Amino acid sequence: MKWWKKLLVLLVAGVVCGAIMRVMALGVSKNTLSASAAEQTYGDLTYVLHNGNAEITGCAAGVTALEIPAEIDGSPVTAVGDSAFLKQQKLQTVSLPDSVQSIGSQAFSGCIHLQEITVSAGTQSVSNSAFSGCTNLEKAVLGDSVETLGSSVFSGCESLAEVQLSANLQKMGGSVFQNCTALKTVAIPEQVQTLGGSTFSGCSRLYQVTLPAKMTEIQSRAFEDCPKLETITLPESLTTLGYGAFQNCSGLQNISLPEQVTEVGDYAFAHCTALEQAAVSGNVLTLGKNMFCDCRRLAEVTLAEGLTELGNSMFLDCVSLQAVTIPDSVSQIGESTFSGCTDLQHVTLPQNLKQIGGNAFRNCSSLTAVAFPEKLKSIGNEAFSGCSGLQEALLPDTTDTLGYSVFYGCTSLERVWLSDEITELGQTVFRQCKKLPEITLPKNLTTIGESTFFS
């Protein structure tokens, strides 16, 4: 019995000793880690050490001027950390040493009295929102070592009027200069290939931008709401133009898409109310929805051969457009493509056209005649509704589908020819066609909709 008691005591002692040793080991490890990452103070600055390098993490409240040293107690200062000076609202001047290689996210964000910043010659990257919301920042100079700008770096810097970007800059995130309302001119360095989404969105005084020859992509909303931008030369290397890239650029007067462009997003030039000329060339197969909608001064459009489809509402409410020739490669016209083009007098439909979408020419009141191509199969709802100047509609034998209200309100329509392939006339197809004296119904017609001929 005593033998078992002694064995039990020994086992318990072993377990306790092992636990103590593990706790001690963990304690040493934890203390060691804490010591290496502990925040320390140097004057008004706080910093931490990483592998012998110092990272600035903050400063005392109320500081108005900062001179960041190149080294602290022999350790080189290589970084300004994330949120290091976030909302230091009394900070007015900062001096950065060449030893700083990176500036962290939101490092100076919200420093509303900071007026000028020079990013040192050794800095390679400036992270997201580093200077965002610095509303009194007037000038920013980036040293030629800077290769990367994160997103929203200067977003909301509404006093920023002068920017000098690094000659070696390669990548820019989105929204870099969003809502920089004092910015007037910018030259993008030659190595930048992609202009990020919303880069200059809301730059209400921006009138001149130089894009690099090697740029291949302009992403969504890049120049949205830049009303002072009157002209821009797109580089020949450009292949992609994103959603709403120039939307609401109400001062833009002309645009020409380069030969290499293969993709144009929806609303690319929507509401460019001063746009008078547009040339779409190159390898674009499909043009985005609402691409030129509400471009009220657009009078001249050139569409290149190779297009297969015109997007919905592409020229919606382009009230100054008088004539357009659609390339023979186009087989489909989308919904509301020319709806509301009240000055449109002449349109040349492509020989390979098979489908006209609903509302495609709705309320084109100046359109007097349309030559329908021989391959046309269907015409969508209200496609020519409200075309009060249209005098005749001679459909080819291939047309077998008419939507409802196709010619509703065509008050000048006097002559109509319908294909025998049509089996149904939808409701109000010829309603209010008051000058139409007679019509020969298709041989295969089985259904006439409600109010089809009501006048």
Regions found by a protein language model. Give the residues of each.
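Conserved functional micro-motifs across diverse proteins
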Residues: 55-56
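Sec-dependent signal peptide cleavage junction
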Residues: 20-39
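Consensus positions within tandem repeat domains that build extended binding/scaffold surfaces
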Residues: 81-84, 104-107, 127-132, 150-155, ...
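Sec-dependent N-terminal signal peptides of Gram-positive bacterial secreted proteins and lipoproteins
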Residues: 3-26
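Short linear/disordered segments characteristic of secreted peptide precursors
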Residues: 27-30, 195, 333
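Structural signature of tandem-repeat unit edges
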Residues: 44-52, 61-78, 89-102, 112-125, ...
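Short, low-complexity interaction segments enriched in Ser/Thr/Pro/Gly
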Residues: 2-3, 27, 225, 432
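Residue-level detector of intrinsically disordered terminal segments
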Residues: 20-23, 171, 214, 290, ...
